[in-house]
C-alpha cells in the first residue's frame, strides 16, 4: 500500500543506522574500555574479552602524578580565553560584512576562507619567532592570540550566515527611531541570533581545546595543554596505551558535556533560517 514501508527497506535502514552508530561510537567505547583495562591485557594475544576493571590509568592521569589534570586546566584556560577574545572581534566583523556595502567584500570572505583551509603548521615558525621576540613564548596569552587565526575566520563565516537571516526591516525601523549601528547590533541583532552565537562559541571552544599544533611550539612545561601531555606517552621505550586512553577520555569530557547541555541551541543554531515563510 502507498505510504507503508517495505519490511526489507526498513531492515536495511536500521542495519545502516546501526553500522553508522558503531562506526562513530565504537572508537569512543574502545578508548573508554582501554582506559579501565589492565595494561597487561590491552593487546594480549589471544585477546582478553573479559577482564577486571581498574582505575589505575585514570588515577595516574588525574591524581598521581596528575599531570594531565593540570594540562586539562591549561587547555580550559586557553580555550575559554580564545573564545572570549574571539567574539568581540568576529561578531562586529560579521555584522559589517553582512550589512555594510563594501567593494572588496567578496575578497575579504575568500581571505577568511583561505585562512580556514591553510594548515596550522604553516604558521608555526612565524608565530614562534614573533612570540619569542616579544617575550610571550611559553605563556597562555601567546596560545590564545595565535588561536585567533583559526577561530576568528570560522566565527565570522558562521555569524555572517546567521546575521544574513535577520530581516533588514527590523534594523531600518530601529534607525528611524535614531538607533546607531552598535545599538542595533548589541540590542537587536545579537538577541535574535543568540542560538547562532552559542553554536559559534561552542565550535570555537572545541577548535581551541583540540588544537595541538600551536601549543606544541608555544607552550612551556607549565602551560602545556592536554594534547601535548598526551604526546608524552609516546616514548622510545614504548607506548603506554592505557594512559593515552585515559587522557583521551578526559579530553573528550568537556566538549561532550558542552554539547549535551546546549544541544537545543545546536539544533536551533544549525537550522536557523532554514525555513522561510
Language-model segments: what does each one mean?
Residues 3-4, 9-277:
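A structural signal for multi-pass alpha-helical bundles of membrane permease subunits
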